[in-house]
C-alpha cells in the first residue's frame, strides 16, 4: 500500500517538476547572469555599481543597481509569463528547441496555425481515441456486466451530463441537445487539462476560443427557441407575460439579455483558465526575482504545487459550469408556459 501511495504522489509531482524544469531552462535571470559572466575583463571597469546612498544632496531618491536589476528581472519574468499564456506561432520545447508554425494568409484574413489551434487538434484526437476505446469496452461486456476502466469513467460522466445537466435543466426534448452538451463538456475539459502538462497550452485561455464556443451555444439556443415556440411564441417569450404597455421596455431588455449571456460565458471561462496559470507562474518566478533558494523551497514551489492541484479541480469545474449554463439557457429559451402549468397541475393532483 505504501508503494502504491508513493507512486500516486510521484505521478502528481513529476508533471509539475517537468514544468518547472522547462521554466528554469527558459529563465531570463540565469541568461542575464551567464551573459554577465561572459563579458571580457576589459569591460569590467565599465560595470560600476550605483552608490549605496538612496538619497542625494537635494533629498531626491537615487535608484541603486540592485533595484534596477530587480525591476529588470520583474519585467522579463512578466514577459515570460505573458508569452506562456498568450497565443503564438511557435511551439516551445525548452531546452530541446522550438517549432515554427506556418503563417497562412487568406486575403486580408490571417488564418495562421497557432499553438492553441494545435492544442485543440490534440484535444479532438484525444477525444476520438478515448471515445473509441470506451465504445469498444462497452461492446465487449454483456448487459448484466458493469463496464470497467475508461468505459466506466466515460459512462459515469455521460450519465451525469444526461441526467443532472441536460434533463434537469432542459426537460422535455433534452435528447436533441445532449450530443452538443456532451461534446462541449469533454472538449473544454481536455483543453483545460492540456494546459497543465509540460509543453502544453490552454486553448480555453484564449478569448477567441471561448467566444466561439459561446457563439455555438447562442445559435443553438435561438434556433431551438424558434423551432419550439415559433415566431409568435418567441416574441411572446420576449415580453415575459407582461402587459402590452410595458413591451417597449421589456423587449429591448430581453434582446440585450440574449446577447449578454454568451458574453458572460466567454469571459467566465477565459478569465478563470487564464488566472490560474498566471498565479502558478508568478509564484514560481518569485524565487527567480529574489534569487533565493530558501524562498523557492519554502514558498514558491509548495504554493505552485497547491495551485496546480487546484487547477485540476478548476478544469473540471469550468467545463461543468459552461455546460450547465448552456443547458440552462436552452431550457429557459424553449420553456412552454402551457407545459409548465400542466406540470404544476399534475404535481398538485398528486
Curated annotation (Swiss-Prot):
Pfam families in alphabetical order: ATP-synt_A
CDD domains registered for this protein in UniProt: ATP-synt_Fo_a_6
Tree of life domain: Bacteria
SUPFAM superfamilies in the cross-refs: F1F0 ATP synthase subunit A
Signal peptide from the UniProt entry: 1-26
Family recorded in the similarity comment: Belongs to the ATPase A chain family.
Function per UniProt: Key component of the proton channel; it plays a direct role in the translocation of protons across the membrane.
PANTHER family linked: ATP SYNTHASE SUBUNIT A
Matches recorded under HAMAP family: ATP_synth_a_bact
Protein name: ATP synthase subunit a 2
Source organism: Chlorobaculum parvum (strain DSM 263 / NCIMB 8327) (Chlorobium vibrioforme subsp. thiosulfatophilum)
Gene: atpB2
Amino acid at each position: 500500500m505504501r508503494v502504491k501511495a508513493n507512486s500516486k504522489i510521484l505521478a502528481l509531482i513529476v508533471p509539475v517538476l517537468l514544468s518547472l524544469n522547462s521554466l528554469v531552462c527558459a529563465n531570463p535571470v540565469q541568461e542575464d547572469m551567464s551573459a554577465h559572466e561572459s563579458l571580457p575583463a576589459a569591460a569590467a571597469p565599465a560595470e560600476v555599481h550605483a552608490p549605496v546612498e538612496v538619497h542625494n544632496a537635494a533629498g531626491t531618491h537615487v535608484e541603486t543597481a540592485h533595484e534596477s536589476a530587480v525591476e529588470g528581472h520583474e519585467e522579463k519574468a512578466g514577459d515570460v509569463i505573458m508569452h506562456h499564456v498568450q497565443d503564438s506561432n511557435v511551439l516551445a520545447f525548452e531546452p530541446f528547441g522550438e517549432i515554427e508554425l506556418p503563417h497562412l494568409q487568406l486575403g486580408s484574413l490571417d488564418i495562421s496555425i497557432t499553438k492553441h489551434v494545435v492544442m485543440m487538434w490534440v484535444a479532438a484526437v484525444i477525444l476520438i481515441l478515448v471515445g473509441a476505446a470506451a465504445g469498444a469496452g462497452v461492446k465487449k461486456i454483456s448487459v448484466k456486466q458493469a463496464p470497467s476502466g475508461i468505459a466506466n469513467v466515460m459512462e459515469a460522466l455521460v450519465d451525469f451530463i444526461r441526467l443532472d445537466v441536460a434533463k434537469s435543466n432542459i426537460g422535455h426534448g433534452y435528447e436533441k441537445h445532449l450530443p452538443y452538451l456532451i461534446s462541449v463538456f469533454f472538449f473544454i475539459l481536455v483543453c483545460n487539462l492540456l494546459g497543465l502538462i509540460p509543453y502544453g497550452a490552454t486553448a480555453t485561455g484564449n478569448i477567441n476560443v471561448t467566444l466561439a464556443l459561446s457563439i455555438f451555444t447562442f445559435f443553438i439556443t435561438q434556433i431551438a427557441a424558434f423551432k419550439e415556440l415559433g415566431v409568435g411564441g418567441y416574441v411572446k417569450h420576449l415580453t415575459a407575460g407582461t402587459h402590452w404597455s410595458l413591451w417597449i421596455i421589456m423587449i429591448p431588455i430581453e434582446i440585450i439579455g440574449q446577447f449578454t449571456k454568451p458574453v458572460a460565458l466567454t469571459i467566465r471561462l477565459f478569465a478563470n483558465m487564464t488566472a490560474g496559470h498566471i498565479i502558478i507562474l508568478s509564484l514560481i518566478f518569485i524565487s527567480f526575482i529574489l534569487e533565493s533558494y530558501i524562498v523557492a523551497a519554502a514558498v514558491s514551489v509548495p504554493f505552485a504545487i497547491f495551485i496546480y492541484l487546484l487547477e485540476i479541480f478548476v478544469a473540471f469545474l469550468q467545463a461543468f459550469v459552461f455546460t450547465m449554463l448552456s443547458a440552462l439557457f436552452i431550457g429557459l429559451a424553449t420553456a412552454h408556459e402551457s407545459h409548465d402549468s400542466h406540470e404544476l397541475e399534475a404535481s398538485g393532483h398528486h
